Amino acid sequence: MHTVIRSATKEVLLGHDQKFCIIGERINPTGRRIFQEQLRAGDLSAIERDVAAQVAGGAMILDINMGVPLTDEPDLLGRAITLVQSITDLPICIDSSVVEALEVGLAAYQGRALVNSITAEDDRMAAILPLVKKYDAAVIALPNDHDEIPMEPEKRLALVDKIVRVATTEYGIPLADIVIDPLAMPIGADPQVGRSFFETVYAIRQRYGINMTCGAGNNSFGMPGRDELGASFLPMAIASGLTSAIMEARSPRMVSAVKAADVVMGNDEWGMAWIGDYRSKMAAVKAAAEALATQ
């Protein structure tokens, strides 16, 4: 089963038989005080640098979040999307908790977006799924509701059942366009959340075969050595059935771990992408050494 996300000129497929999809997380003001101040002043120049760094790192889709307090988020998100699609052909994941901002972003986008996100809450689905249908988008869905963020895989799976039923039968969203986020949680707060996540991913794949994503950094939040933890977490999640992640595309360690997992899972045929990347790295090392020798 494939989820199709595309820009005006480029298409990306999410699927269990496809390379793992790296969704760049960087265009997000959360925890970035200077970036927030720039956005409040109407300065979007940092976005251009974020795009360039993530493209160079290997991002395949770019998540865009403009959730800055004391700003007009719909206007800011629309401007950011217009800017990003003017400088890269990578597809976009439109990330907002504000329904009005999502609609402005979807209207501004020249492609088929991934919407981030809905939950199993009835009011959230009622507000956003009509937009997903109207703009022929795909949507990320989280199995939590007003009552709780469940820890048990069985409870999460029950909420996935609800989301799938409501989205497909009440709003006509194709199953392939529902991308479940099984809820990666901080291992520093509870040592069992990693195991629970992998079990949830596996159960969702067995029941529905649909695509899944997560905020990969959530797993290592509050811990030292976050790149190392992410580089262990992601291949294990991929083996369980995860097909994409909103992640730090500027981390060579995590990106390499994902690409290695593609080889091991049989989604990089004959390891050709891995070999090509390795040769490029060796050529860069050789060029740097030769340049140093001539100084």
Segments (PLM) and residue ranges:
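Domain-level signal for soluble alpha/beta catalytic cores
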Residues: M1-V179, M185-Q295
